[in-house]
UniProtKB/Swiss-Prot annotation:
Active site residues according to the UniProt entry: 47
Protein name (record): Astacin-like metalloprotease toxin 4
Chief location: secreted
The organism's taxonomic lineage, starting at the top: Eukaryota, Metazoa, Ecdysozoa, Arthropoda, Chelicerata
CC annotations in GO: extracellular region
Expression sites (tissue/organ): Expressed by the venom gland.
GO BP field: proteolysis
PANTHER family reported in the protein's UniProt record: DISCOIDIN, CUB, EGF, LAMININ , AND ZINC METALLOPROTEASE DOMAIN CONTAINING, METALLOENDOPEPTIDASE
Entry binding sites for Zn(2+): 46, 50, 56
Source organism per UniProt: Loxosceles laeta
Enzyme class per UniProt: hydrolase
Length: 114
């Protein structure tokens, strides 16, 4: 849909599921891609969460107090999704939320077999 707004979330069918975290510094359209397998309610909410400024719950600076990330089990090319954010570069809201829509599931991007 067309808009006269300068800053907006541009939701489109893409190759992957992604959105920038928060508003772009320079403004303008912010892409939110919903690729194959990305159109379930939870994934759409997750990507919208990124678009309004929420980081992954498992990337919190204090995440090691709540969970263990086995980086050797992460699919190649997705290691960045599990990096811990610096405390002075992000803000946490409340306690760690194991039920957060911003927390990847147990086997998300897992390269092994179950």
């Amino acid at each position: 849909r067309e808009t006269n707004e300068n800053d907006y979330v541009d939701i489109h069918k893409g190759d992957k599921c992604y959105s920038r975290v928060g508003k772009s510094f320079n403004g303008g359209p912010q892409p939110l891609s919903l690729g194959k397998g990305c159109t379930d309610f939870g994934t759409i909410l997750h990507e919208l969460g990124h678009s309004v400024g929420f980081n992954h719950e498992h990337s919190r600076s204090d995440r090691d107090e709540y969970l263990i990330v086995h980086k050797e089990n992460v699919l190649s090319g997705y290691e960045r999704d599990f990096e811990k954010l610096w405390e002075n570069k992000t803000r946490t809201i409340g306690d760690f939320d194991y039920d957060s829509i911003m927390l990847y599931g147990l086997l998300c991007l897992f390269k092994g077999s179950v």
